């Protein structure tokens, strides 16, 4: 993969427009989770150190296109960056027809989704954005799977288009895990539905030595193995698909292990009583909410011996502590493992935070949908654009 890197470019006196993923939760005008903002700071600081006049743009939330809505304004992000950066930071509400920006200053554009045509990758809008800069920097891995005006179109028309350090680092880490992984390679795919992760499971089943399924996804595989899953969330219409995936994994020398013990309850609630059962003893009224300790230990042993671990999705309803022990044990096993580990996806990152293992994971991916599409082997439009511009 050949793309230009911002680190390698001369930026002194240049107008540099950086597309970051600053889509953070905001409550009462204050940013409530700053992980994405912290991840973007090194790129912005590097551009400043290189002597650039810096412009930053992002979307925030899902406003109606073409309408200003204070609830989705970038102002709280500007307030955060003003404290985090040792330079002037200001918001530009009107910028498409030109914006004044000085070297050593950061101008944050108002929410790109306030512009009509952003999501449809409107060419006229993209050209206006491109005309604002000498160098366009795509640094938002979290939106790299979307071909939109601020992530794709602008890069086609800017004088120079390159990847920022965050995007470049993300691609390098994912490439290391998927293109030439240290073996054995283990992938843990959780989540509620097989249907939403089917292409990921198909793609990974042929690449990995061990594919571990968790959450509602695992229930479909439990049912496919001939066990009763009671009232658990599962997809009866995908049982044959689950059987096919297991057969495909086994024919390649791998496997998709099914839990031998599970934690069940009669209802989905924070106060539900957790009961441990053998997987063959699940009753018609039970709902499976976690894997049991024997299954968790077996998976921990697999992780302990792995060379590479890709984690996307918890193995139980860890938001409720009585159904969190399986995910907690998996998290601890990843933390203790010498494997190169990558964690990605919103629920996964929440588990990483809850069990305090962030500093023990080799790489934490900032992308949700983009992370999944990369695992599926799909081409990310923003990356394809950068490759074409590097020719």
UniProtKB/Swiss-Prot annotation:
Q: SUPFAM superfamilies, alphabetically? A: Phosphoglycerate kinase (SSF53748)
The UniProt entry's GO biological process terms, in alphabetical order, are: gluconeogenesis; glycolytic process
User: Could you tell me where this protein is found in the cell?
Assistant: Cytoplasm
Q: Which GO terms describe its molecular function?
A: ADP binding; ATP binding; phosphoglycerate kinase activity
Supply the Pfam families for this chain. Answer: PGK
- EC number assigned by the record: 2.7.2.3
Xref: PROSITE patterns: PGLYCERATE_KINASE (PS00111)
> Which parts form a coiled-coil structure per UniProt?
none
List GO terms (cellular component aspect).
Answer: cytosol
Residues engaged in binding ATP = 197, 319, 345-348
Q: Which InterPro entries match?
A: Phosphoglycerate_kinase (IPR001576), Phosphoglycerate_kinase_CS (IPR015911), Phosphoglycerate_kinase_N (IPR015824), Phosphoglycerate_kinase_sf (IPR036043)
Q: Which family does it belong to?
A: Belongs to the phosphoglycerate kinase family.
UniProt subunit comment: Monomer.
Protein name as it appears in the record:
Phosphoglycerate kinase
Show the taxonomic lineage: Bacteria, Pseudomonadati, Pseudomonadota, Gammaproteobacteria, Alteromonadales
């Amino acid at each position: 993969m050949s793309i230009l890197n911002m680190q390698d470019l001369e930026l002194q006196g240049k107008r540099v427009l950086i597309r970051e993923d600053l889509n953070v939760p905001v409550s009462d005008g204050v940013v409530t989770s700053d992980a994405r903002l912290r991840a973007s700071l090194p790129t912005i600081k590097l551009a400043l150190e290189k002597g650039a006049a810096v412009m930053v743009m992002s979307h925030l939330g899902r406003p109606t296109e073409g309408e200003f809505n204070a609830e989705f304004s970038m102002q709280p992000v500007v307030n955060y960056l003003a404290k985090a950066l040792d330079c002037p930071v200001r918001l530009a509400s009107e910028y498409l027809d030109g914006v004044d920006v000085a070297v050593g200053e950061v101008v944050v554009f108002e929410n790109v989704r306030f512009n009509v045509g952003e999501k449809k990758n409107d060419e006229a809008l993209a050209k206006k954005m491109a005309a604002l800069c000498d160098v366009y920097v795509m640094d938002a891995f979290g939106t790299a799977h979307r071909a939109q005006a601020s992530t794709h179109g602008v890069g086609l028309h800017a004088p120079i288009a390159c990847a920022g350090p965050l995007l470049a680092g993300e691609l390098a880490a994912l490439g290391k895990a998927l293109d030439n992984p240290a073996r054995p390679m283990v992938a843990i795919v959780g989540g509620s539905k097989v249907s939403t992760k089917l292409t990921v499971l198909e793609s990974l089943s042929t690449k990995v030595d061990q594919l571990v399924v968790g959450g509602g996804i695992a229930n479909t595989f439990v049912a496919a193995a001939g066990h009763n899953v009671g009232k658990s969330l599962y997809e009866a219409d995908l049982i044959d698909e689950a059987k096919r995936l297991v057969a495909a994994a086994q024919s390649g020398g791998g496997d998709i292990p099914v839990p031998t013990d599970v934690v069940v309850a009669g209802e989905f609630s924070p106060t539900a009583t957790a009961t441990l059962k053998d997987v063959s003893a699940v009753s018609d009224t039970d709902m499976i909410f976690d894997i049991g300790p024997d299954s968790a230990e077996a998976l921990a042993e697999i992780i302990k011996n792995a060379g590479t671990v890709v984690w996307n999705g918890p193995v139980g309803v860890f938001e409720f502590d009585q159904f969190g022990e399986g995910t907690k044990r998996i998290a601890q096993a990843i933390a203790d493992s010498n494997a190169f580990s990558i964690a990605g996806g919103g629920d996964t990152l929440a588990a990483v935070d809850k069990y305090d293992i962030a500093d023990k994971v080799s790489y934490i991916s900032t992308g949700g949908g983009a992370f999944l599409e990369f695992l599926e082997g799909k081409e990310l439009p923003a990356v394809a654009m950068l490759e074409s511009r590097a020719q």
